[in-house]
Structures are given as C-alpha cells and as structure tokens.
Amino acid sequence: MASAIEKPLLIYSDIETDTFQATKILQIAAITENGDIFNVHLNPNADLPLHCTNITGLYFYRGNLYKNGRLVPSIPIKRGLREFKRWLQSFNKPIHLIYHNGFSFDAKIIVKQFLKHSIKFPVNVLNIHDTLPAFRKELVEISDHRLATLAKHNKIELTNAHDALADSVALKEICEAFVKTKPIDIYDFLNLYVKPVDFFTKKELEKLNKNEPK
C-alpha cells in the first residue's frame, strides 16, 4: 500500500513593526497548528515613532525595549531571525506559513530582512498563505476584514491586539473556527491565496540588488 502524502505543518505568524513602512521589526511570533509557540522581541536601538507606541505599547528608552511601562527582553534583529529560522527548521517537515495581509506586508518584510542580513530563508518553508484576501472572498457580508473584526465575527476573544503572539493565536483560532462552518477543510481555505516562498525571495532580491550602490 502506498504511504499517504505527508501534509505540511501549518504555522500562523505575525510581526510588529515600527512604522507602516516597516523600517524595523519589533516582534516576531508564531504558533503551529499543534500549539507550539515562538515569540521574540527585537531591540530597535533607536527611538520609536509615537504612533507605533500608541498602537503597540512599545517604546525604546536608554537602550531597552519597553511595553506599557514594563521592560521587555529583546535581542538584535539578526539573532532574532536566526532563532526564528532554527525554530522553523526544528520541525523537520514541510511548512506553510500563514499571515493575515501577508502578501502586502508581513511576508514581504520578513523575507526582506532575512535577505538584508544574509540569512538564507528556511528551505522547509514551501509556501506562504494570506488569509486577508481569502476572508474577503468568503465573507463578503461583513464590513471589513481586520483581524479584530474577524475575531468578533467568529466569536474569538482578541484581548491584546497588535501583539504579534496574540494576533498569531487569534488568526489560528479564527481560521479553525471559520472552516468548521464551511464544507471545506483548512487546506482548501488557505490554498485560496497561496504563493511559493520563491516568489517573495526573488522579488525582494531584485529590490535589494537594484538599491545597492554601484
């Protein structure tokens, strides 16, 4: 009897950044479909814009990162990326990374930072999924498709919005709750909007090479 094809491990992820242009990543978090968690804060080594602090509660003071008045352990960006890579590789199986608004924001930024710091993206990460256009397609009846709105629609509690770990956990719970109401499984839903990692690495490499001084 032929062995069943191994399904990829689904990992829901999110990042927090300093601005909408995302000059610095401040937090990388992820949760697997089985509940394994990754969470790290990154030291920006510079003051953060006021609107960033207003949204995330994060601010930089005297060399340290704080959130809502409390010191947050943080590490340099390069170390954080390497730890994320090691965590992804530790599962020793194909991975699909899932983001909300990933094609326009999270996936582009995380891939760009890997390339910028000369760190090879984990080879076991095959595809990146974006749930934002998927929910727009499947839930046309709601007013918007922000994570908080989707959480409310699916009766999921989101108590710490704009924290990458809380948002990753919420995204996982939202997707799992949603597919229970539809005649499709989680893979069918996620595959509505999926791109291979190569799509992002090639695009970002082209940008980096174009912007390098001659």
Indicate residue ranges for each PLM-predicted region.
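Active-site flanking residues adjacent to catalytic metal/cofactor-binding acidic residues
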Residues: S13, H129, A166
